[in-house]
Structure formats: structure tokens, C-alpha cells
């Protein structure tokens, strides 16, 4: 293989120098050149046949202008093609890939990337390893460089690999042309907007001939303009040439897009095999789809998995539906229910009340006011009702309905976890890790504001409902706690006062077993701070209740 001699300049060789490929695919290239020359002859013949058929069927001048002019001999055609090949070689000095002498070359010619024309930037070692694994024809050293002087805006990857972009005026059947980036006439519209096909040799628009759509390119009816790029492994398109293009392929207007991720991310496993349809031949598909095109399919994957996850919970649903399909057999009506059924319409007509409870009360009073003889009539009707019910449903029992009702209650309880299952015992174990000094630092927002006013604590805490509130409100943010010693043996705690507890030693010893609250004492009048005040008594009462159940806020603060 030819190696780079110097620092990788642009002028390492002549512009018109032909590079010899000493590659593993050299024999394939010779065979493919013969095949391509035969294909060129077939194209000339088919175009002549095409033109003669169209001229005989239609004399429209516009249509004849779109067809290629008849070539009298093959020599002028060969000169024209060689002229384009020479111009292309001079134009892409330092280009990424050199166009082959045959523009209709059906196979992908991968050149030697170590040729002296490649400069400015290099493949990373990880990319080089991947290329060697995937495409054994490429031997890419770390100093090999990639450059396309003609690409208007090469999209650079994160690993300094420039991505060659197609111009907009590119032949739509790009797999028929190996990577030749030649511009066609400026007046021609883009290939994805024009219905006709541009001739790769002359740039003259014409309609495709069936002979061009060879078995190498089995096309679907609407995918002529969306054939993927022949360098599908570098420019991320859906398929690779020589592979079938399904009708649901990725339809993007431009055949090449700037890659927005590194090569390693393109070849990563996140492109699952089901995103890219496999060719029917069983050939290995090396085309990697573009991330911007595949992203809708990736976004749909979690949605596609959700039905499979939801099916795990569905087997229980048919069981419930089967139970609901069973007819609910009501038990036979008793005497009072028969009386209500008969008299309810009369009571509703007499009274303006619409509530069912009030109507039932009126019917109950009237039932009790009836004499034995009047009630006996309804008891007889109830007996007949039971007999008829036993004939219709011989194996029926009232326990069936009650069992269903209990099952429904159990299902409702299992669906909604109850908060009453929290036991206060594990909460007390977290108390020794708390300090009362930290508790009293900042009063809480909701209850602290409630306790700021002098009248509110005495009224709220002295009421009999105060201890019940401490039981029910388990998540109250009051920082209430007891010292571990006081929780064990202290039964009559004293409410601490800032002045008195600091004055005497007995007061300080009692403060160890005291209840600490974030209550601003400055906002309370002195009458509420006395030992006989209702505020003090209510605090002691709530403290006894607190020794039994401690609020949830103590547990959460210990975790922090």
C-alpha cells in the first residue's frame, strides 16, 4: 500500500496522477470495470431505442430536448466521458474519494485512504478499529487524513471526521455513480424536485429506462428519488446500494445530511435491527440510518413497550369481567319492602320532598302505624315472593351477594394503601438522634403562625379536641420531642420557661425531661405562662398524648 511520505500536505502528488489500488478487491475492480463498460454500451443502445420510440410516438419538441442526442459512434462518447473524468479528478484534488473512470460503476469502489491526497484531520483510533472490523478493505492509520475541498459546509464530528455533504444538484440515482460530486447545469432543479433523471455524463435530463434499473437496484414504485448514498457507512442513509429499497424507507429530500454525532455513536447498538428493514437477499446491511431520521422510531419505542407492560395487569381484568357478567340475583322482598314499593309513589306525590331518606322515614312511620291485619297482607305477599324466588333460583343463597361485597371492599383496600398502617413504635426509636436545641431554632410556618397570637393557643390547646388532633395529625410539622430519659420514667413533666429554667438547678434538671416547642414566648402574655394557666395544662395534656404516639415529622427530620 502507498504510505504517506511527509507531513500530509496538499501537494504531495500531481493532480492528474492515477492512484493504483493494491487492495484485496483489485480483481473485483477489473471485473466490475468490464461489467461497467458493457453497461455503458447498453445505456447507449437503450437511449437510442428510447429516442426512436418516443420520436415515433410523439413529436413534441420539449420531450425530445430532454432525451440525450443520438451518438453516431462510441468514440465520441468515450472522449466525452474521459473529459468529465479528467475534470473531476482535477476538481477533487485532496478529495475524500476519487471518481472512477466509469460513472455508471455498479459496485462501491473503496479507495486506499492512505493515498497522499488525503490530508487535514484524521480518524480516531476507535473509528479506525471499527472501520477495520466492518470494512476489511480499509486500512486506516491514525495519521491518515480526510478532506473534501468541494463540500460547502462539511459537518464535523466530535472526533474530527469531516462529513462530506452532497450538493443539491446531484444525480438522484446516486448508487449508480460512485462518489462523484460534480455539479450539473445551474438551470436544472434539484434532483428530488425534478421528475426526470439527469444523465450522469452530459447533465441532460431524461426519463429512466428499465434497463438502467438493473437487478442490482430493485426499486419500489415511489422511491426513485430516495436511493441511499453509496457510502452508506459514512453518510448515514437508510440502505446500501445493491440492496433492495422498501417502499417505507426513510424518505428524506436530500441524499446526504451532516452527522450530528460521532462515528462511535452512529455504530452503537442503539440502532436496533428492527428500525432498518433487512434486504430480502439476506445480505448484510451496513447502512446506518441517520439519527435525525431514526429519532421518531426511537421515540416510539417506549410507547411500543408500554402495551406489553400493560398486558401483565390485564389477565386479572377478564376475571373481574366474568364475575360482573354473572347476573346479580337480588334477594326476595320482605313485607316492608313490598309496602314501600306500593306506597312510595303516593308519598312522593303528596310531599314536596325529593330526598330519599326523608321519604323512607315517612314510609317507616306509616308502616308502624298500620294494624296487624293490614301488615298481614304484605307478609303474605312476601311469602309468595320467597317461594317464587326459590323456584327461579333453586341454588341461590344470600351469602353470595355478601361475599361479593366483601371482595369488592378488599380490592378497594388493596388498590389504595391506607395510611393508618403506620405504627408509632419505630418512630420513637429515631428520637435519640434528635436534639431539642435544633428543634427550637425555627418555628414552622403553618402552626407557628397559629401559635403567634395569644388567644389562639389557649383556646385551641385547652379544648378537649386538642389531644385528638395530636393523634390524628401524624404529619403535623410541630417539632415535638422528648428526651430518651424522660420517655422511660418521667410522668409529670414541667413546661420549661426560659427565665426560670436558667435560674435554678432543679429547673435545669427538669428541663432535660421537658417538652420543647417552637413557640415564641415573647408573643405570649405573662398570664399564659403561669403554672396554673390553661395553656400550661393543655401543654401537659398534649405531652401525655405525645408519649403514646409521636408525629411523623420527627421521623423525617431524623433522616435528614
Curated annotation (Swiss-Prot):
Renumbered residue ranges of the record's region Disordered: 1-77, 297-328, 395-513
Keywords for the protein's UniProt record, in alphabetical order: Activator, Developmental protein, DNA-binding, Nucleus, Repressor, Transcription, Transcription regulation, Wnt signaling pathway
GO biological process, one term: midbrain development
Induction (UniProt): By ctnnb1.
Low complexity composition bias: residue spans: 46-61, 453-472
Cited SUPFAM superfamilies: HMG-box
InterPro entries on file: Catenin-bd_sf, CTNNB1-bd_N, HMG_box_dom, HMG_box_dom_sf, TCF/LEF
SMART domains: HMG
Cellular localisation: Nucleus
Coiled coil residues, start to end: none
Subunit structure as annotated in this protein's UniProt entry: Interacts with tle3a/gro2.
Protein name (Swiss-Prot/TrEMBL): Transcription factor 7-like 1-A
Amino acid at each position: 500500500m502507498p504510505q504517506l511520505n511527509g507531513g500530509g500536505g496538499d501537494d504531495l502528488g500531481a493532480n492528474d496522477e492515477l492512484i493504483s489500488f493494491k487492495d484485496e478487491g483489485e480483481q473485483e475492480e477489473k471485473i466490475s470495470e468490464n461489467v461497467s463498460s458493457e453497461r455503458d454500451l447498453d445505456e447507449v443502445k437503450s437511449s437510442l431505442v428510447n429516442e426512436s420510440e418516443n420520436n415515433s410516438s410523439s413529436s413534441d419538441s420539449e420531450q425530445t430536448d430532454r432525451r440525450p442526442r443520438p451518438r453516431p459512434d462510441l468514440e465520441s462518447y468515450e472522449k466525452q466521458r474521459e473529459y468529465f473524468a479528467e475534470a473531476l479528478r482535477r476538481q477533487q484534488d485532496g478529495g475524500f474519494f476519487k471518481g472512477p473512470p466509469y460513472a455508471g460503476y455498479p459496485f462501491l469502489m473503496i479507495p486506499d485512504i492512505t493515498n497522499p491526497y488525503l490530508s487535514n484531520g484524521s480518524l480516531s483510533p476507535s473509528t479506525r478499529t471499527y472501520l477495520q472490523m466492518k470494512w476489511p478493505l480499509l486500512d486506516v492509520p491514525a495519521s491518515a487524513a480526510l478532506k473534501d475541498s468541494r463540500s460547502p459546509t462539511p459537518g464535523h464530528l466530535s472526533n474530527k471526521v469531516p462529513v462530506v455533504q452532497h450538493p443539491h444538484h446531484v444525480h438522484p440515482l446516486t448508487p449508480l455513480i460512485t462518489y462523484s460530486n460534480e455539479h450539473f447545469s445551474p438551470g436544472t432543479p434539484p434532483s428530488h424536485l425534478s421528475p426526470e433523471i439527469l444523465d450522469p455524463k452530459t447533465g441532460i435530463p431524461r426519463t429512466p429506462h428499465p434497463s438502467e434499473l438493473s437487478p442490482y437496484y430493485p426499486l419500489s414504485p415511489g422511491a426513485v428519488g430516495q436511493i441511499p448514498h453509496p457510502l452508506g457507512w459514512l453518510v448515514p442513509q437508510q440502505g446500501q446500494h445493491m440492496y433492495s429499497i422498501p417502499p417505507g424507507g426513510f424518505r428524506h429530500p436530500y441524499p446526504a445530511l451532516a452527522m450530528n454525532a460521532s462515528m462511535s455513536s452512529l455504530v452503537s447498538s442503539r440502532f436496533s435491527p428492527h428500525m432498518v428493514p433487512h434486504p430480502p437477499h439476506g445480505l448484510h446491511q451496513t447502512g446506518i440510518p441517520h439519527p435525525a431520521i431514526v429519532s421518531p422510531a426511537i421515540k416510539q419505542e417506549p410507547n411500543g413497550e408500554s402495551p406489553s407492560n400493560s398486558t401483565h395487569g390485564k389477565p386479572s381484568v377478564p376475571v373481574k369481567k366474568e364475575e360482573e357478567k354473572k347476573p346479580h340475583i337480588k334477594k326476595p322482598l320482605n313485607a316492608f319492602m313490598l309496602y314501600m314499593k306500593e306506597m312510595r309513589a303516593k308519598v312522593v306525590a303528596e310531599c314536596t320532598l325529593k330526598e330519599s331518606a326523608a321519604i323512607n322515614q315517612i314510609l317507616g312511620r306509616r308502616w308502624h302505624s298500620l294494624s296487624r291485619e293490614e301488615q298481614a297482607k304484605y307478609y303474605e305477599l312476601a311469602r309468595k315472593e320467597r317461594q317464587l324466588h326459590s323456584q327461579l333460583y333453586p341454588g341461590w343463597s344470600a351469602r353470595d351477594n355478601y361475599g361479593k361485597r366483601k371482595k369488592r371492599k378488599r380490592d378497594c383496600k388493596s388498590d389504595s394503601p391506607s395510611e393508618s398502617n403506620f405504627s408509632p413504635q419505630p418512630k420513637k426509636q429515631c428520637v435519640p438522634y434528635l436534639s431539642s436545641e435544633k428543634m427550637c431554632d425555627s418555628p414552622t410556618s403553618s402552626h407557628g403562625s397559629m401559635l403567634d397570637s395569644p388567644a389562639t393557643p389557649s383556646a385551641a390547646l385547652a379544648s378537649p379536641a386538642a389531644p385528638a388532633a395530636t393523634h390524628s395529625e401524624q404529619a403535623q410539622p410541630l417539632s415535638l420531642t422528648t428526651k430518651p430519659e424522660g420517655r422511660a420514667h418521667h410522668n409529670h413533666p414541667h413546661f420549661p420557661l426560659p427565665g426560670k429554667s436558667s435560674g435554678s438547678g432543679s429547673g435545669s434538671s427538669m428541663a432535660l425531661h421537658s417538652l420543647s416547642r417552637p413557640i415564641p414566648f415573647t408573643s405570649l402574655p405573662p398570664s399564659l405562662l403561669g403554672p396554673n394557666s390553661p395553656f400550661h395544662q393543655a401543654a401537659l395534656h398534649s405531652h401525655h398524648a405525645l408519649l403514646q404516639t409521636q408525629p411523623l415529622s420527627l421521623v423525617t427530620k431524623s433522616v435528614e
